[in-house]
Amino acid sequence: MEIQGKIAVVTGGASGIGQGLVERFHRDGAEHVVVVDRDEVGARAVAESVGGTGVACDVTDEAAIRSIVDTTERDIGPIGLFVSNAGYVTLGGLEAPVEDLTRMFEVHVLAHLYAARAVIPYMADRGEGYLLNTASAAGLLSQFGSLHYAITKHAAVSLAEWVAITHGHQGIKVSVLCPQAVHSNIVSNSPDAEKMVGTGSDVAGADGTLTAEDVADTVMDALRAERFHVLPHAEVADYVARKGADVDRWIGGMQRWQGSMFPADQHPATWLTGS
């Protein structure tokens, strides 16, 4: 897929990876970009910088997502690419409240589902369209110190796989973005932001922290190649291959790595058992 001449919608587009993609799409010739974010001021500012449209929206509100899709199709034109990108991270293991998991599932999984079922009928009717869903390397591997993040990002990857398998014959292409650490506000947006600094939960930065521009470069290459996995950190492909080759060995290695990342009295197991 080439973005030139296409209309794109980007959720979580006011900052971080989303903003980087908005700016890159514009630079590479997108006809129009709709910037969606719960931060209305930020969405409008980013949209104004690229001559696009800024819209405030809670991505867990299905009616609001459907309205954005319908309005864009009616007033701007056919959506060629929908980027479902909003997300955040928290600390917690088995002891964490189920309500926290429910909220994260809404943002990381249901938001992707709502977008897909709003936009795919339009795309299928035209015989073409592209979905780019942001997940995480945690969705292919795991996430030390955040059970909810690991669960929901795996679910996000699974949802993207299902959509690709089920709607591919209708001309729907799907890619899933699975980065490790990126300079963004995903941690600062977390209710556990202060607690996360300097803990083993920051293992995602072990292979370096990329800029949003770095991620955008990888995304554009993947879109052109229509590649399902978008891996800004090349090391992730090797980790996934090792996991697939011998999952028991991989789990053992992850156990040892997690043990080295947390002081014994702060190990995630102690959050439930106390020791």
Language model features with spans:
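The beta1-alpha1 cofactor-binding region of Rossmann-like NAD(H)/NADP(H)-dependent oxidoreductases
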Residues: 40-41, 57-67, 98
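Active-site-adjacent segment of SDR/Rossmann-fold oxidoreductases
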Residues: 28, 141, 162-173
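SDR active-site lid
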Residues: 166-234
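Conserved mid-core segment of classical short-chain dehydrogenase/reductases
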Residues: 66, 88-102, 145-148
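Conserved glycine-rich Rossmann-like NAD(P)H-binding loop of the short-chain dehydrogenase/reductase
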Residues: 30-45
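Residue(s) in the substrate-gating loop at a strand-loop-helix junction
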Residues: 136
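Active-site helix of classical SDR
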Residues: 116, 152
